[in-house]
Amino acid sequence: MLIKKIILLICNFIFLLYADEACGAVVTKTPAYAKSRIEDITGVKIPSDAKMVFHYYNRTSWQENDEQYSVFEFKSEPTEWLMTNSFSDEKNELLKKDLDYRAEKVGVPEQYRVDSLDDYMWLELNGVDMEYIPNKLCLIVYVRIH
């Protein structure tokens, strides 16, 4: 009888562990979650009019090893927001190569990647890379937590 109780407890623990993962997967796909997570980590608030057009999230374990690749589109240039958050227009080839690698790794469609001809502005804070592409009016955000 004791063995049955122990097995039942172990099964319940495993069920709860996977149920948490499944419920978390639904929440992590929302624009509100993506924006909130970026703000929590960096202090940078993504403008409310930015529309999330692509999102990838993967948590590799319950120990918080995860990555997020989100793309937001704007209707017009968020000039004030870019200046307020100190985005740089100096070229950062290392950041660009890193984002290209990550985009390839997670299977990001071509239209949501940085093109080698694109001008861009960038910001890097607390393990979060942000690249704004003016000619596409889009912001690419890559979060990696280890």
Model-derived regions: residue spans:
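Sec-dependent signal peptide recognition
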Residues: 4-12
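Short amphipathic alpha-helical "recognition" segments used for binding
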Residues: 8-9, 43, 108
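Alpha-helical transmembrane segments
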Residues: 13-17
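N-terminal export/targeting and maturation segments
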Residues: 18-84
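Extracytoplasmic electrostatic interaction patches
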Residues: 86-146
